[in-house]
Amino acid sequence: MENKSNSQILFAEAQQYIPGGVNSPVRAFKSVGQEFPRFIKFAKGAYLYDVDWNKYIDYIGSWGPMILGHCDDDVLEAIQCQVKNGLSYGAPCKQEVDLAKKIIELMPNIEQVRFVNSGTEATMSAIRLARAYTGRNKIIKFEGCYHGHADEFLVAAGSGALSLGQPNSPGVPEDVVKDTLVASFNDIESIQALFEKYKDEIACIIVEPIAGNMNMIFPQDNFLAKLRAICDQNSSLLIFDEVMTGFRVALGGAQSIYNVKPDLTTLGKVIGGGMPVGAFGGRKEIMQKVSPAGPVYQAGTLSGNPIAMTAGIKTLEKISQPGFFDELGAKAQKLVDGLNEAAKAYDFNFHAKCLGGMFGLFFCSDKIAVNTFVDLGKTNLKMFNQFFAYMLDNGVYLAPSAYEAGFISIAHSDEDIEKTICLAKNFFSRELD
């Protein structure tokens, strides 16, 4: 694509007024070695159009929410009707009740739910609630699992599974993260070791049931069921962070696929239909501790605002129609199968996998197991960057990081998928010349 000048100009201007020129670091494209990101002018269906009028097949979908595609007619109509009645009330509204009822109907282990404004707020609030409910302070998270930018989550593993968390962002005091313990995803022994050392101090385990912030890593060997058992044995809570996987890999989230019951679940992305939203919910006994029903404080000026609630209601109505996830999953499977076949044809070290409307791309042989954050770091990250650049220049917009999952929408056509596969095939053949 030749037309890049307006994005370059805007990025230079943005850096004068916005730190780094973006409002979320990954958008800068630095992690994939690009000089500037593409500034988007508008979006429709499966496509993004940038300020230079380049068209892209979009496999980010605003990082997951756009499961129906951009500017779905029914969602837009619902929002437009609500806009005429007000943007935000700072008071309860019927839409909050309707969306809560729909979530509880569809998610197997949520009895009550509280709305917030982002996934970070949801996970932060769930941790506070778990600590209050158990009367304990320590939490366990997993290396490579991202739960938002609250201080207690910005932790690296240190040396060894038993190391206390050390902050990996300036501005996070060590005292804030001293109660954050870090284990290795899919390594149940690292969890057992932490409980042996801190048995009566651990309030909860928080985990992405499918790790979508280290590409797309699935739980192995009944890992989630084993976490459930350990939490039960030690009177700790199990929190599933389904901000990404909720209503994305299946209608009932990853917990419905693996049939493991968390005590609390965090949600976001899809439940807002593209509007800013988050939620946390779970057993009524626990949720009744949240203010004003109980003593655990949580509040938000725009929480439960009618615009986000309306978008969420319409989105969940549409994705809960019979056959929706069969069709969505078939699209993702066609993409993944085509990419894998193309790589195999050229004996290229690459494999892809998917579940529901979510997929992962790995630049290594399919004979190499990628089950942990460390495993992912051993894949060919440089080759991913080259692949990203080639696909972007040819009109395919992938996540600008080898550590991020991709998303497909119901709006993606067979032609979109076939074009993507064809371009990947060209890349694989070119790299072997």
From Swiss-Prot:
- Signal peptide residue numbers: none
> Mainly localized where?
cytoplasm
GO BP terms:
protoporphyrinogen IX biosynthetic process
Highest taxon listed in the record's lineage: Bacteria
Which spans of this chain does the record mark as coiled coil?
Answer: none
Keyword Cell cycle in the entry? The reply is no
Report the GO terms under cellular component: cytoplasm
Which key words are in the record? Cytoplasm, Isomerase, Porphyrin biosynthesis, Pyridoxal phosphate
| Localization per Swiss-Prot or TrEMBL | Cytoplasm
User: Which reaction does this enzyme catalyse, per its entry?
Assistant: (S)-4-amino-5-oxopentanoate = 5-aminolevulinate
| Essential cofactor(s) | pyridoxal 5'-phosphate
Pfam families under this entry? Aminotran_3 (PF00202)
The record's family statement is:
Belongs to the class-III pyridoxal-phosphate-dependent aminotransferase family. HemL subfamily.
Subunit-structure text = Homodimer.
- Which PANTHER family would you find in this protein's record? GLUTAMATE-1-SEMIALDEHYDE 2,1-AMINOMUTASE, GLUTAMATE-1-SEMIALDEHYDE 2,1-AMINOMUTASE 1, CHLOROPLASTIC-RELATED
- Official protein name in the record: Glutamate-1-semialdehyde 2,1-aminomutase
The organism encoding this protein is Francisella tularensis subsp. novicida (strain U112)
